[in-house]
């Protein structure tokens, strides 16, 4: 796989997954390393996707930590960890998903799709246990992207503007943080009047 097909953020995620594999003394870069770096990325797309699904992100990270602690370790070989066969399959699935979505580059959300689609890894099981499946990811992604496609290597920056600078009023209302409308008849009437005005020709 050619890494120049990845967005800048996706390249960074793969690099951090490799760093995490070195840190955990793993002989391979696994799907669990990849998922941990995706979920930990605060300025990425994965956290907003999972938040829209109401997923316990810290719960996922805790499970990943437990899995990574149990993984086999190697010491003193001086060799870089290699990409596991399962992770190679995830990259292939992610690329297929990017093609299906007519995206020109493989971005971080495609990596999340790939993990969810490749059902044999512990990372995929952790996602399933938290109710994260491919169809749910796609629905959440559509809301975040707003119809935009990945046409360059900085695509995530562009379609995250809405997430970063906007506010999801549905979530705010569900959390009970919206001001009540009771007793504000004049304001409501005025808003309806403004919204229902026809444009003069």
Model-derived features with residue positions:
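Histone-fold recognition with a strong bias for associated Lys/Arg-rich disordered tails
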Residues: 1-201
């Amino acid at each position: 796989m050619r890494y120049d097909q990845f967005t800048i953020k996706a390249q960074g995620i793969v690099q951090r997954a490799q760093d995490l594999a070195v840190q955990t003394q793993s002989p391979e870069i696994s799907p669990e390393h990849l998922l941990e770096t995706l979920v930990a990325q605060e300025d990425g797309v994965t956290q907003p996707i999972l938040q829209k699904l109401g997923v316990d992100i810290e719960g996922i990270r805790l499970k990943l930590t437990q899995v990574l602690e149990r993984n086999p370790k190697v010491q003193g070989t001086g060799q870089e960890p290699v990409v596991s066969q399962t992770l190679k399959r995830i990259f292939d699935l992610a690329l297929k998903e990017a093609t299906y979505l007519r995206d020109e580059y493989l971005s971080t959300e495609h990596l999340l799709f790939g993990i969810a689609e490749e059902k044999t890894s512990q990372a995929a099981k952790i996602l399933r246990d938290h109710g994260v499946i491919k169809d749910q990811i796609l629905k959440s992604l559509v809301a975040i992207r707003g119809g935009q496609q990945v046409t360059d290597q900085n695509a995530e920056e562009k379609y995250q503007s809405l997430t970063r600078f906007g506010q999801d009023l549905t979530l705010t209302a569900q959390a009970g943080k919206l001001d009540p409308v009771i007793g504000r008849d004049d304001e409501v009437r005025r808003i309806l009047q403004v919204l229902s005005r026809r444009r003069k020709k």
